Amino acid sequence: AAIQEADTVIGYVTYIRLVADLLDGKEIIRKSMTEELDRAVEALSRAREGKKVALISSGDAGVYGMAGPTFEVLLQAGWTPPAITLETDEAGHEQRIVGDGIEVEIIPGASALNSCAALVGAPLTHDFCSISLSDLLTPWPTIARRLDAAAQADFVVALYNPKSGRRTRQIVEAQQLFLRHRSPTTPVAIVKSAYRRRQHIEFTTLDRMAEADIGMLSTVLIGNSNTFMQHGLMITPRGYANKYDVTGDRGVKGGERSGRSLSSGLNGWLQSLHADHAAGMSVADLAAQYRLPVDYIQASLDAPLPEPEVSKSRRKTPAASGSPEGNA
């Protein structure tokens, strides 16, 4: 609807082509891959002329899309939202600020990680993150630190912009960083052009990931230590097997309680931490065991232990005479 209502449509050449059937009678402004700021400037210029402008992205505009660059350009140009807002000056007095009349609406879409996950099974059922391998705007050491941290923390990871004609080594570097923390057989799914005409899906493993057919239109999903492949599906368990007998009567496992934190949750872990330390384990050894910072372990030991959870039970009212319970 937003594109159909627009007077002007601005976007990357490929994205314009994807919505060609919606563009009859509209002003179309095509820009190249590296002209994101120019697109935002053009959108502001046309909006100031009184036109409705659709600035299109693939996936979700707020995930590696045009939402961020657009707001940066608008704010640098002195734009404020059209609604009357209140701000407080240095003296504590409220000031009324009226915007310049240009309304901006971010319309959410399905990001590549959502679309790709739906095509390959359920890989994002537990904690995950996304990392772009594009170093056009981000220094490589920053990207590498994020990759290493995500790999060590056992996130399922969606890699955006994994490879291009010029950027071919980044995916290899990412693989090497992940192999420092993950099994070589960790499941990997590579989805190219999700839900488009040339859609292609390939399943592989972490040790062979860099050999796969990967390009700019690909999204790479790397599983965590519990992710598995079965019947052509990539699945990351949510963790129910930690608490429940998922193969038998679905009952709660010994030592666990339904609706309460795991025995290895925060309170249980703190109890174990204190017990291990009292038994002679050093702070450094505990930090190494849990792969957590030494100062965090020390702070956890310095803090008072939380009160243990106590199960609350209500006194059962005696059954009235003549009831089934009373006759039992």
Where on the chain are the PLM-derived regions?
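Short, solvent-exposed alpha-helical "recognition" segments
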Residues: 295-313
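Class I S-adenosyl-L-methionine
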Residues: 1-104, 210, 250-260, 267-272, ...
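A contiguous loop/helix-start segment that scaffolds small-molecule binding in enzyme catalytic cores
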Residues: 152-265, 271, 312-318, 324-326
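Helix-turn-helix DNA-binding elements, focusing on the entry/boundary residues of the two helices
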Residues: 283
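Short, acidic/turn-prone active-site loops that include or flank metal/cofactor-
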Residues: 13-15, 30-38, 110, 129-137, ...
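Short alpha-helical "recognition helix" segments of helix-turn-helix
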Residues: 286-287
